[in-house]
């Protein structure tokens, strides 16, 4: 949003996975990383990749600046391991080696987004930023999360709330 001063979050679309009195946690879903690739991560973890996995390009996203060496998988809920955080009735988040192994074997969830790191807020911080118009809130959308072209996610998220990105301004209160 125009009032977001932190360059790590400029034009970011973040799916908030948890938000309570203690704080909030979310994953940036529109910042694809050039490196490492999913196959490189599998090699580092010494996890064999199936033939299908090697031929399928699995993107890796910068999920946020916290715990950037840790993988977080946002996914559809037909997959629900014991350690899955159920976010809503369609989406879960799992951060285990087990789901990475299943993705490598081609047996993981139907829809998934692999992110390194997460965006985190302390108690009341996200609410405060929302009140200052640093963020806009959009209803969850499976297509936006899993199927939309990465470079179009920000514009598509704004369209969902009736905002034209071209009309946004970083200036306010000047006559």
Named regions from a protein language model:
Residues 1-115, 119-175:
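A short aromatic-anchored loop/beta-hairpin motif
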């Amino acid at each position: 949003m125009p009032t977001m001063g932190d360059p790590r979050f400029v034009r970011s679309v973040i799916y908030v996975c948890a938000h309570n009195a203690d704080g909030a946690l979310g994953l940036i879903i529109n910042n694809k990383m050039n490196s490492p690739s999913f196959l490189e991560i599998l090699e580092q973890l010494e996890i064999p990749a199936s033939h299908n996995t090697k031929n399928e390009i699995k993107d890796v996203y910068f999920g946020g600046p916290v715990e950037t060496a840790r993988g977080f998988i946002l996914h559809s809920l037909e997959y629900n391991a014991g350690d899955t955080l159920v976010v809503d009735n369609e989406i879960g988040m799992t951060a285990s080696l087990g789901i990475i192994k299943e993705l490598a074997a081609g047996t993981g969830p139907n829809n998934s987004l692999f992110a390194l790191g997460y965006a985190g807020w302390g108690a009341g911080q996200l609410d405060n930023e929302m009140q200052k118009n640093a963020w806009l809130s959009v209803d969850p959308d499976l297509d936006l999360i899993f199927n939309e072209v990465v470079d179009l996610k920000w514009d598509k998220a704004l369209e969902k709330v009736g905002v034209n990105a071209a009309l946004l301004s970083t200036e306010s209160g000047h006559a």
